Amino acid sequence: MACRGCLECLLKLLNFLLAVAGLGMIGYGIYLFVEYKRVTDNSVTFDLTNGDQSYVSFGRPILMAVSLSSNIFDNLPKAWFIYLFIGIGVALFVISCCGCVGTCSRSVCCLSCYSLLLILLILVELGFAAFIFFDNSWRDELPSDRTGNFDTIYNFLRENWKIVRWVALGAVVFEALLFLLALMVRAANTPAEYDSDDEYLAPRQQIRQPFINRQAAPVTGVPVAPTLDQRPSRSDPWSARMREKYGLDTSEFTYNPSESHRFQQMPAQPNEEKGRCTIM
């Protein structure tokens, strides 16, 4: 019990940190969106010359413009990066809420959904990392940016690659730890099936019934002393277990000191008086 409580407290703490991270991403994404709208209203639009497309340059590197070229990203909004950033924050917050609800209510279903969402998030992150690592032309797959802001961000990540690498690895390890804790808490809250007479007698439906249902018949006449069938049944856990599992009435096979009067000893025959003649 103490170990389960410790695991639940640790899982709640880590989920709280995950929720704070998600809310932070949502708040910062909203701030970026407000800045984007403000800069868009005050931006300078270049005129089209020789069939070239127009671009908008922003003061912040993350608020970069997306060229309106004829590729698969034509249908993306200009602020797709902000929407993606907010979406990741919402996903983290929803996952953390699912984990908190499952931990507080000790719901096996919520903990299972939480574990599934975590493993999906880890797989997506690993797939994205593998795509960047193995595909050397991954930069060509991104929407083109002629403002130079993407190169600025890329150079910043490359210069601080050691820090960025450990931060990314720490995030994956953190999520893997959450996944393992969720599995442990789920296993601790799973109801056990007891099938031994020495273990806790869990309340469950009585599946096995006695082979013979004894029904007391009305008796008329002079009342007599209680017989075996009229004895009250015992209500201790072992007797209840025997009646449930085997359909046995333990009052017939066990000794109860309170009913010791049932077994009346036969009166001892009087010893023969000594001094009398005995005929052989």
Swiss-Prot record:
Residues bearing PTM Phosphoserine: S196, S233
Family matches, as InterPro entries: Tetraspanin/Peripherin
Annotated localization: Vacuole membrane
Tissue: Expressed in rosette leaves.
Pfam families tied to this protein: Tetraspanin (PF00335)
GO biological process: viral replication complex formation and maintenance
Name under which the protein is recorded: Tobamovirus multiplication protein 2A
Annotated Basic and acidic residues bias: 271-280
Keyword annotations from UniProtKB, A to Z: Membrane, Phosphoprotein, Transmembrane, Transmembrane helix, Vacuole
Cytoplasmic side: 1-13, 100-113, 184-280
Residue ranges annotated as Extracellular topological domain: 35-78, 135-162
GO (cellular component) term, any one: plant-type vacuole membrane
Annotated segments matching region Disordered: 258-280
The family this protein is said to belong to: Belongs to the tetraspanin (TM4SF) family.
Membrane topology: Multi-pass membrane protein
Subunit structure: Homodimer. Constituent of tobamovirus replication complex. Interacts with TOM1.
Consequences of knocking out this gene: Reduced efficiency of intracellular multiplication of tobamoviruses (e.g. crucifer strain TMV-Cg), characterized by a reduced amplification of TMV-related RNAs.
TM stretches of this protein: 14-34, 79-99, 114-134, 163-183
Biological function: Necessary for the efficient intracellular multiplication of tobamoviruses, being a component of the replication complex.
Source organism, top-level taxon: Eukaryota
Principal location class: membrane
Gene behind the chain: TOM2A
